Amino acid sequence: MYLHKLQQDEIFVSNEMKSLKSITGMPSRKGLENAIISNGKIVNVVSSSYGHIPNELFFKKAEQLLIDAHLKYHKRTINRDDRSFITDFIIEDDHQFSLKNEEGKILTMLRFKNSYDGREKTSGHFGFYREVCTNGLHVSNAQIDFSIKHTKNNTELILPKLNGLFERFLDNQYYEITQKLGKWKK
């Protein structure tokens, strides 16, 4: 199956938040107190209220939820210049569908995003992975389930939001959507 050809970028790159003063030896203005360093490069300059969320914490927790639920999945990881990261968990089960004369298989997908440069909020959503051709090209259709700004107070909200998305996925949304896809197939 085409899933063995999924992109596998390294997403667990070294990262830290350091004060600009410790890097430059000069004081910085209010609102630009810290630098986010990813894989040896400064990718963002942030205020002291910024909440840095390491990929190891976020993506490993998401994967552990799938493991604990005994779901079979394929993982695709995307690293955009050591500043923005995506992990897709493509669920392999009996609820896969084919469209257009058995071409274009559709599988359930959970997508999680995190960025160190501030361009994207940490988010997770439920969607679909569709094989368009055998080289693994895909399109996805999804709804954002949670999206959280990087502030110190909000970092405590991420793991409960992640758990909530996963519980709704297992409870009913996944099965309601697979029933709708089954109707489209007919």
Where in this protein do the model-derived segments appear?
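Feature for intrinsically disordered/low-complexity regulatory segments and propeptides
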Residues: 1-61, 70
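Intrinsic disorder/low-complexity polar-acidic segments
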Residues: 67-186
